[in-house]
Amino acid sequence: MKQTIILLYGGRSAEREVSVLSAESVMRAVDYDRFTVKTFFISQSGDFIKTQEFSHAPGQEDRLMTNETIDWDKKVAPSAIYEEGAVVFPVLHGPMGEDGSVQGFLEVLKMPYVGCNILSSSLAMDKITTKRVLESAGIAQVPYVAIVEGDDVTAKIAEVEEKLAYPVFTKPSNMGSSVGISKSENQEELRQALKLAFRYDSRVLVEQGVNAREIEVGLLGNYDVKSTLPGEVVKDVAFYDYDAKYIDNKITMDIPAKISDDVVAVMRQNAETAFRAIGGLGLSRCDFFYTDKGEIFLNELNTMPGFTQWSMYPLLWDNMGISYPKLIERLVDLAKESFDKREAHLI
């Protein structure tokens, strides 16, 4: 009997378009000799829509439902995703997706799911909290100032100008895929950047800008996590924003990255240490800055990285000899392993 994968995609965050791309890729790459795929779309308003089922490879004409093609007659209760023995693959990015909320819902349903648990998902989603945890693990990061809604913005800007130097980058604490991030060269630009970031979150991070290469490491495993050789994001634009990542195709990837063996070893060790520090499970992608001075800063841990066939995370593992379809199989197996462990603890 074939294993059922419940593919959850879409979602309420600004990264829902990326989720659809990732889900389409998974749907096409699955080994249908082993798996059946059932898909559920989460609309921008948070409704669950039962969409397609695939027992064999979809044709080129098959497309997953999006916010533009919703069939509201197929709206179901969220709990309708439950199926005995099925594994959920929540290909959801950003808030209300990889922040622990969906993970908690799936644990209430007693369903195995791919990826990090409630704690590690919510922790890694918040950039400020992640920085504080990684500081305790002794991992170097770019200098920063945290600003929370209700703070005296003028005083916080003064703190930024005392501790950091322009240019700085302003980021919503709970957001990914470069959404809401701005580069500022002066105080007026910083004020505008803060206004933009606060549109997406009530907690904001201002980081020191660094002249650095962007290097990424893939992580796979539960309690025996393994890492990939690093890959490098090569940009055609000064700032790796959402449009450059997903819409304009202004980036390329160099896999493996052209860096020394010593730097590779440090990055892989730091990535594995960071994954363990947040209690990671299943998968993550760890992003580093590598400066002209040879400094290595851990930028962020992404617990549900972009998962299209051309995304960095699957390509990193392909370089290590694990193909995209085999990577999906491995993640499903890890989901069942972590589910069994979690259930065994409930005595």
From Swiss-Prot:
| Subcellular localization | Cytoplasm
Alphabetical UniProt keywords: ATP-binding, Cell shape, Cell wall biogenesis/degradation, Cytoplasm, Ligase, Magnesium, Manganese, Metal-binding, Nucleotide-binding, Peptidoglycan synthesis
- Residues binding Mg(2+) 2 are 300, 302
Entries under SUPFAM superfamilies matching the protein: Glutathione synthetase ATP-binding domain-like, PreATP-grasp domain
Which superkingdom? Bacteria
Q: Which cofactor does this sequence's record say it needs?
A: Mg(2+); Mn(2+)
The answer to whether UniProt assigns keyword Ligase to this entry is: yes
Q: Which residues form the ATP-grasp domain?
A: 131-333
Residues holding Mg(2+) 1? 287, 300
| GO molecular function terms attached to this record | ATP binding; D-alanine-D-alanine ligase activity; metal ion binding
Q: One Pfam family of this protein, by short name?
A: Dala_Dala_lig_N
Tell me how the cofactor is bound: Binds 2 magnesium or manganese ions per subunit.
Please tell me one Gene Ontology term that the record gives under cellular component.
cytosol
GO biological process annotation, one example: peptidoglycan biosynthetic process
Enzyme Commission code: 6.3.2.4
Q: Which InterPro entries match?
A: ATP-grasp, ATP_grasp_subdomain_1, D-Ala_lig_Van_CS, D_ala_D_ala, Dala_Dala_lig_C, Dala_Dala_lig_N, PreATP-grasp_dom_sf
The primary location reported for this protein is cytoplasm
Enzyme class, top EC level, equals ligase
Q: Where does ATP bind?
A: 161-216
Biological or metabolic pathway of the protein: Cell wall biogenesis; peptidoglycan biosynthesis
Q: According to its UniProt record, which reaction does this protein catalyse?
A: 2 D-alanine + ATP = D-alanyl-D-alanine + ADP + phosphate + H(+)
Any idea what job this protein has? Cell wall formation.
What family does the Swiss-Prot or TrEMBL record give for this protein?
Answer: Belongs to the D-alanine--D-alanine ligase family.
The name this protein carries in UniProt is D-alanine--D-alanine ligase
